[in-house]
């Protein structure tokens, strides 16, 4: 039996500005992955998606999932748009090199011109110089459940897509999307747990666990698979 043990790699950029009230997660997937995405959503948040969106008090890194595209840390929410803007101004956010995006959620019928106008309204509530090309921080607004929401937007890390071009692969290896989902479902998003892949093959699941910040060990009875897993990692 050959064992492959990975090291735990973690990194974070922490910007403490606002305390979130809750989090809005936006999902995207191919139609044949809908049930798989709902399974993951139940494991991570305790609920299934509603129109590819989950609103939750549970904080998760978007990159843990192959389906989560971004997480909005909602700091201001109000049904009245003018009061919503006043609340943002009251925060007194002062910084340079920011940008404001508009998240289009299913059911939002605002046209492009209206969305641009909303972005500008919110941008004028922030004291500082925007940077549309290389922002240091991204804010976003959206309209969900008859309420306007504002907060810091965290996007997925798409580097995991490169793992489809691993040095070694078997014809019966599971796909990268399935591997990434298995990690999030098995762990329920808790990076403190240690995972075990008892038949790791070329290390597809292990690689996705490592890049998401999990500790994982793997083993395989096939020496060829063992060496290929090491090279892939």
Kindly label every feature range from the protein language model.
Residues 1-2, 9-130:
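Non-catalytic nucleic-acid substrate-recognition regions in nucleic-acid-modifying enzymes
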Residues 20, 136-138, 147:
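Broad gene-expression machinery/nucleic-acid interaction feature
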Residues 112, 116, 135, 172-176:
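Short, amphipathic alpha-helical segments
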Residues 130-140, 195-199:
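Short, surface-exposed recognition loops or helix-turn segments adjacent to catalytic cores
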Residues 174-233:
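Conserved S-adenosyl-L-methionine
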């Amino acid at each position: 039996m050959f064992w492959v043990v990975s090291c735990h790699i973690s990194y974070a950029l922490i910007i403490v500005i606002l305390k979130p009230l809750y989090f809005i997660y936006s999902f995207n997937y191919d139609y044949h992955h809908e049930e798989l995405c709902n399974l993951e959503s139940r494991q991570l948040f305790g609920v299934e998606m509603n129109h590819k969106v989950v609103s939750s008090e549970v904080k998760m890194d978007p990159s843990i999932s192959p389906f989560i595209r971004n997480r909005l840390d909602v700091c201001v929410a109000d049904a009245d748009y003018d009061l919503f803007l006043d609340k943002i101004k009251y925060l007194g956010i002062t910084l340079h090199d920011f940008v404001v995006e508009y998240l289009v959620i299913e059911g939002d019928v605002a046209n492009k011109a209206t969305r641009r106008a909303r972005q500008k309204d919110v941008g004028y509530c922030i004291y500082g110089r925007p940077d549309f090309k290389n922002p240091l921080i991204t804010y976003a607004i959206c309209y969900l459940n008859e309420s306007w929401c504002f907060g810091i937007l965290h996007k997925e890390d798409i580097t995991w897509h490169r793992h489809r071009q691993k040095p070694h692969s078997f014809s019966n290896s599971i796909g990268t999307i399935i591997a990434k989902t298995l990690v999030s479902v098995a762990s329920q998003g808790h990076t403190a747990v240690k995972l075990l892949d008892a038949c790791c093959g070329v290390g597809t699941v292990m690689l996705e666990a490592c890049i998401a910040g999990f500790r994982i060990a793997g083993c395989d009875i096939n020496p060829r698979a063992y060496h290929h897993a090491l090279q892939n990692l």
